[in-house]
Amino acid sequence: XSNSGDLVDAVVPYMGESIS
């Protein structure tokens, strides 16, 4: 993701949408 987890996407792009 890149849809939801902006901050998270930076470190865990594969969980960007999962974490939120």
From Swiss-Prot:
Which pathway does this chain act in?
Amino-acid degradation; L-lysine degradation via saccharopine pathway; glutaryl-CoA from L-lysine: step 6/6
Membrane-spanning residues where?
Answer: none
UniProt entry keywords in alphabetical sequence: Acyltransferase, Lipoyl, Membrane, Mitochondrion, Transferase, Tricarboxylic acid cycle
**Annotated EC:** 2.3.1.61
Q: Name one GO cellular component term.
A: mitochondrial membrane
> What is catalysed by this protein?
N(6)-[(R)-dihydrolipoyl]-L-lysyl-[protein] + succinyl-CoA = N(6)-[(R)-S(8)-succinyldihydrolipoyl]-L-lysyl-[protein] + CoA
**Which GO terms are recorded in the biological process aspect for this UniProt protein?**
L-lysine catabolic process to acetyl-CoA via saccharopine; tricarboxylic acid cycle
The places in or outside the cell where this protein is found are: Mitochondrion membrane
Per its UniProt entry, which superkingdom is the organism in? Answer: Eukaryota
> What GO molecular function annotation could you give as one example from this UniProt entry?
dihydrolipoyllysine-residue succinyltransferase activity
Task: Give the note describing cofactor binding and stoichiometry.
Answer: Binds 1 lipoyl cofactor covalently.
Q: Name where it mostly resides.
A: mitochondrion
Q: Which cofactor does it need?
A: (R)-lipoate
Its family remark reads: Belongs to the 2-oxoacid dehydrogenase family.
Binding partners and assembly: Forms a 24-polypeptide structural core with octahedral symmetry.
- Name the job this protein performs: The 2-oxoglutarate dehydrogenase complex catalyzes the overall conversion of 2-oxoglutarate to succinyl-CoA and CO(2). It contains multiple copies of three enzymatic components: 2-oxoglutarate dehydrogenase (E1), dihydrolipoamide succinyltransferase (E2) and lipoamide dehydrogenase (E3).
Protein name in UniProt: Dihydrolipoamide-residue succinyltransferase component of 2-oxoglutarate dehydrogenase complex
Q: What is the lineage of its organism?
A: Eukaryota, Viridiplantae, Streptophyta, Embryophyta, Tracheophyta
